[in-house]
């Protein structure tokens, strides 16, 4: 059974992602989420704290998904493991909830540096580290793997992610992501 904090975040998630920070109040989260105000305020004294908590929670859920990804199969080659990792990552980041969170982060993150920091430290920094480890397993020098990992992530997300953020969905996007991932893997291991 989930702890109370997780229950609150699950209840608040659709409200915050639908209405954003400006359109959300803690009172409405309590009412729509079926949570007592006292419990909500005990765990999250402000909507900014709730938003930051939600960002951390979503990053944690995505990390758990990556840990169960086929890339964990050490019998596969590092290149295949990297491709698997990038497929899971791109699939997660183009989910509607992640796109909504990212849009909110871009719109409001500058006012809430803690949220931006959580997203970076609990999300993308960990992803880059995991990818750097896969690159190192394939022969990329440890001194270079961090930089190359950032490049690999950027290439894998590419134009497809930018279109998804803007709400542009086109036939063939899945093929475009597959091509971007292939190019990212090729780039990553060309740095040996």
Q: Which residues are covered by each model-predicted region?
A:
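Helix-turn-helix
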Residues: 7, 15-49, 53
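Hydrophobic alpha-helical connector segments
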Residues: 53, 66-102, 145-152
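Short loop-to-helix capping motifs
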Residues: 46, 108-113, 158
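Generic hydrophobic, amphipathic alpha-helix propensity
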Residues: 4-13, 29, 54-58, 62, ...
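Hydrophobic/aromatic-rich alpha-helical bundle segments in the mid-to-C-terminal region
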Residues: 136-184
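Amphipathic alpha-helical packing segments from all-alpha helical-bundle domains
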Residues: 80, 93-100, 104, 113-140, ...
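Short, flexible, glycine-rich and Lys/Arg-enriched loop motifs at helix boundaries
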Residues: 57-76, 164-177
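C-terminal alpha-helix
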Residues: 15, 134, 180-192
């Amino acid at each position: 059974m989930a702890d109370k904090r997780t229950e609150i975040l699950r209840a608040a998630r659709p409200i915050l992602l639908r209405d954003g920070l400006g359109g959300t109040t803690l009172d409405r989260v309590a009412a729509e989420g079926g949570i007592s105000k006292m419990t909500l305020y005990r765990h999250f004294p402000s909507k900014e704290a709730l938003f930051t908590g939600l960002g951390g929670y979503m990053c944690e859920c995505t990390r758990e998904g990556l840990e169960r990804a086929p890339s964990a199969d050490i019998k596969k080659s590092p290149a295949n493991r990297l491709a698997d990792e990038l497929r899971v990552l791109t699939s997660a980041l183009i989910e509607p909830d992640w796109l909504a969170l990212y849009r909110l982060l871009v719109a409001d993150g500058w006012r809430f540096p803690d949220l931006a920091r959580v997203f970076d430290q609990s999300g993308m920094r960990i992803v880059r580290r995991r990818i750097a480890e896969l690159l190192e397993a394939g022969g990329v020098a440890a001194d270079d793997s961090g930089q190359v990992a950032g490049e690999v992530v950027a290439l894998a997300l590419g134009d497809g992610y930018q279109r998804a953020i803007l709400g542009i969905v086109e036939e063939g996007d899945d093929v475009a992501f597959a091509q971007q991932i292939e190019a990212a893997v090729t780039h990553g291991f060309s740095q040996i």
